[in-house]
Every structure is written in structure tokens, then in C-alpha cells.
């Protein structure tokens, strides 16, 4: 188990960095007007991967072994590396020239040169200030402790236990201190204020900008609700109908289809008409309606209902997420010397909020489900389930399946419905923030004008 945890941590670090860099590289390769299409294409890739991954993983788990869920990453990751090296030319150099330069650098390296040429004080300053080591450590530790508190609360420990309270309080305090450090202390300790590469993890000039805060809150809230829906849509079919992991994952196909359609449509509309906020609001409205419809999904729902209610969440995220990233990038002042760095920072912050919402959505959904399920089982006085943890109850249910309309089937259905109600709340808040987002849009040049990247306030 320890090896599994360490492996997942390493994979998560790489995966989160890949997503951010894909958007940064993709968006910088084209002009601003073509950027919506690039964002749409990348979003489609991530949306398909996010759904196809669980389906393939479920098939491996059901028919082979769960270890293949990890083995399959080796050829896929290797192919991705080869494609990247052969196609991306950061310095307009071919892959062979880059390899020759790297070999030349390594062959000419000696420890004596390193010892005399490298100033270790400057090296430490680079680690601390270029990578914002302290801000990153405080932020990461705070978020991890807070999420652990939500995970353990009501499951391994009671909510009023010292362990859970300590996790939650320390997590919040560390996260707040990371903001204080980045916003107010970083510049005071910075030994090279004029060095543009010495920047905090969260730059106050950008992060504290109301338009950027609002649009990233949209991303955070919608991703929180969406991931809760995705996780417990699969759990709905596994726990209530005893579907295998593979068959339960197949029910997510409607979301893939609608998400891809909406993402492509969003990119085309933004490129042709320059619209951003209308797409945000449209996506927010679809999200609220879709989340409301998902609360109608119970153990007595028909097959058509189970498929139909999963369509709108895909449409919602397809329209809203692309527009939110585009809106965040439009807030950059392009005539500043740091505009290129600001662009990377804003894109990375938007991706961070997306990842944070996805993570928190999974944890909060599990917390709501576990608390609801445990309380309902306790009130029902079901003898086989008394005195068991939620995980043990679920295991017993799967080993002693008694149908979807049994007492425990009804309890599971009601508990999952509570998760969907929570998701509806996040979508409603997301729609509220959509309404207050920036009105900036892309300017579409007239036919007799030279296309230029520009902004316009409406």
C-alpha cells in the first residue's frame, strides 16, 4: 500500500504539470483569435481521457487485474514523450540538434568547473525564490491536511475528534499563511526584486484581481460539482445495481459525447463571434438544470432517465470551462513587460483551480455519502450492517447483494441523491459567479482590416 501511495503521488505531480504545460504551450503557439479552438481541442482530449480511463480501468479490473491500470501507462507515456520530442521545437532546433547540444553540455561538464562557477548562495536563492519553495510547501501541506480531515471525518474518526479538528484547523491556517507569505512577505525577502523569474507561486497583482478571482471561482465550483457527479454516477450503478466496474463506467459515455460536442462548439463560436461571457452563462444554466435533473435519478429510474440526466452536465462543462480559461487570459495587460509570464501564471492558476475543484469534489462527495449512508443505516437498525464502518458495509452489500429495491438499496439511492443535491449547490454558486464575470471579449477584425489580437470591453 505504501508503494501504491508513493507511486500515485509521483504520477499526480507529473500529471498536474502536464495539463498546465499543455495549455500553456498550445495557447502560445497560436494567436489570440485561434486560441479558443486550441483550448477546445485540448479540453476534448482531457475530457475523453477522463472518461475513457475509468472505462478501460474497469475493463482491466473486471477481466484481467487492476495492475494493468498502471502497466498501460508505460507504452502510452512513452509514445507521448516520443511524439513531443519529435514535434515540439522550443528553440527552433530539431530533435537531433537538441540531443547533440545536450550531449555536448554533459561531456564538457566537470565537477571542478561546477564547484568554481556555481555560487551556492545563488543556487539556494533560485530554489527558494524562483520556485517559491516556502509558498509551495505551505500551500501543499495546508491543502493535504484539510483534505485528510474531510476524508477521515465521520469515517475513521468522529467529526469532533482531536485528529479531525487538528487536520482541518492546521490545514486552513497553513493555506492562509501561504497566501500571506506570497502576497506580503515574498517581496520583502526577495534578494533580487528586478529578477523577473523570482516570482511567488500566487502573484497578488494577478490573483487578487476581481475578474480573475471570479472566473477562477467559476472553474473551481463547476469542477467540484462535476467530479462529484461523475464519481457517484459510477457508484450509483455499482452499489445499487451491482454492475461491474467496466459496465458502470460505460454509463459515462453520454457525458463524453456531449462534452466533446460542447467544447468544439464553444471554440468555434468564440473564434467566429468573440463571445466569452454568454457561453459561460449558458454553460452555467445548463449545469444547474442538469444537476437538478440528476437528483431525480433513483433506484426506480428507467434506463432512458439514467442516460438522459447525464447529458446536460457534459454540455455544461464543455461550454463553461473553455470560456472560463479564455476569460481569465483576457484579463492580462498585454503591454506590460511581464505579459508572457503573466499569461503562464494565469493559465497555471486556472488549471490549479480546476484540479483543486476536482479533488475537493471527490472528497466532499465521499464525505456526504458516507455520513448519509451511515446515519440512515443506523436509523434503520439493519442487523447485518450494525457496528461496521461504511467501507465494511459496502463490502458486505456487494458480497450479499439483495436487489436494487431492497431496504439497503433504497438507503444507497437516497444517500447518493444527497451527493447530487450537494453538487446542485455548487453548480448554483458557479452560475452566480458566471453572472458577475468580466464582459471582455475577443475583437473579430472586419473583412477589410488586418487581423490583430486585441481586447474590448463591452
Curated annotation (Swiss-Prot):
Protein function: Transporter required for vacuolar uptake of histidine and lysine.
Keywords of this entry: Amino-acid transport, Glycoprotein, Membrane, Transmembrane, Transmembrane helix, Transport, Vacuole
Compartments, record wording: Vacuole membrane
GO BP terms: basic amino acid transport; transmembrane transport
GO molecular function, one term: basic amino acid transmembrane transporter activity
Subcellular location, principal: membrane
InterPro entries, sorted: MFS, MFS_dom, MFS_trans_sf
Side Cytoplasmic, residues: 1-9, 58-67, 154-163, 227-248, 299-306, 437-458
Superkingdom of origin organism: Eukaryota
GO CC term, one of those recorded: endoplasmic reticulum
Membrane topology, record value: Multi-pass membrane protein
Regions that span the bilayer: 10-30, 37-57, 68-88, 133-153, 164-184, 206-226, 249-269, 278-298, 307-327, 416-436
Glycosylation sites: 195
Positions on the Vacuolar side per record topology: 31-36, 89-132, 185-205, 270-277, 328-415
Protein name per the record: Vacuolar basic amino acid transporter 3
Pfam families membership: MFS_1
Family: Belongs to the major facilitator superfamily.
Amino acid at each position: 500500500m505504501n508503494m501504491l501511495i508513493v507511486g500515485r503521488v509521483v504520477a499526480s505531480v507529473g500529471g498536474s504539470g502536464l495539463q498546465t504545460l499543455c495549455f500553456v504551450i498550445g495557447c502560445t503557439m497560436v494567436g489570440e483569435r485561434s486560441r479558443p479552438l486550441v483550448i477546445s481541442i485540448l479540453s476534448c482530449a482531457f475530457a475523453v481521457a477522463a472518461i475513457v480511463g475509468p472505462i478501460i480501468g474497469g475493463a482491466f479490473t473486471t477481466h484481467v487485474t487492476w495492475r494493468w491500470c498502471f502497466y498501460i501507462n508505460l507504452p502510452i507515456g512513452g509514445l507521448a514523450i516520443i511524439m513531443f520530442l519529435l514535434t515540439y521545437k522550443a528553440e527552433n532546433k530539431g530533435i537531433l540538434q537538441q540531443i547533440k547540444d545536450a550531449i555536448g553540455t554533459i561531456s564538457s561538464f566537470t565537477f571542478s568547473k561546477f564547484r568554481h562557477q556555481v555560487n551556492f548562495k545563488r543556487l539556494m536563492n533560485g530554489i527558494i525564490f524562483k520556485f517559491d519553495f516556502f509558498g509551495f510547501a505551505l500551500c501543499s501541506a495546508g491543502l493535504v491536511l484539510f483534505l485528510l480531515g474531510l476524508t477521515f471525518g465521520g469515517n475513521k474518526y468522529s467529526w469532533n475528534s482531536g485528529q479531525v479538528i487538528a487536520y482541518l484547523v492546521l490545514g486552513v491556517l497553513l493555506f492562509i499563511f501561504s497566501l500571506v507569505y506570497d502576497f506580503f512577505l515574498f517581496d520583502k525577502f526577495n534578494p533580487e526584486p528586478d529578477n523577473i523569474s523570482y516570482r511567488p507561486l500566487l502573484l497578488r497583482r494577478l490573483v487578487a484581481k476581481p475578474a480573475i478571482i471570479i472566473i477562477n471561482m467559476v472553474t473551481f465550483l463547476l469542477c467540484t460539482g462535476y467530479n462529484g457527479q461523475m464519481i457517484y454516477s459510477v457508484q450509483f450503478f455499482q452499489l445499487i445495481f451491482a454492475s461491474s466496474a467496466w459496465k458502470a463506467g460505460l454509463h459515462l459515455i453520454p457525458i463524453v459525447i456531449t462534452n466533446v460536442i460542447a467544447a468544439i462548439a464553444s471554440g468555434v463560436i468564440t473564434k467566429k463571434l468573440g463571445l466569452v461571457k454568454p457561453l459561460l452563462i449558458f454553460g452555467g444554466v445548463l449545469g444547474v438544470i442538469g444537476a437538478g435533473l440528476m437528483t431525480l435519478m433513483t433506484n426506480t429510474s428507467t434506463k432512458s432517465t439514467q442516460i438522459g440526466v447525464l447529458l446536460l452536465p457534459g454540455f455544461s462543462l464543455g461550454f463553461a470551462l473553455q470560456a472560463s480559461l479564455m476569460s481569465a487570459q483576457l484579463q492580462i495587460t498585454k503591454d506590460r513587460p511581464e505579459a508572457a509570464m503573466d499569461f503562464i501564471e494565469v493559465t497555471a492558476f486556472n488549471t490549479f483551480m480546476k484540479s483543486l475543484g476536482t479533488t475537493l469534489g471527490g472528497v466532499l462527495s465521499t464525505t456526504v455519502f458516507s455520513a448519509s449512508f451511515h446515519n440512515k443505516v443506523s436509523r434503520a437498525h439493519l442487523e447485518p450492517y450494525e457496528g461496521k464502518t461504511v467501507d465494511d458495509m459496502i463490502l458486505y452489500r456487494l458480497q450479499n447483494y439483495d436487489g436494487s429495491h431492497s431496504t439497503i438499496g433504497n438507503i444507497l439511492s437516497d444517500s447518493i441523491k444527497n451527493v447530487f443535491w450537494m453538487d446542485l449547490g455548487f453548480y448554483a454558486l458557479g452560475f452566480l459567479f458566471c453572472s458577475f464575470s468580466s464582459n471582455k471579449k475577443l475583437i473579430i477584425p472586419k473583412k477589410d482590416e488586418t487581423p490583430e489580437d486585441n481586447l474590448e470591453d463591452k
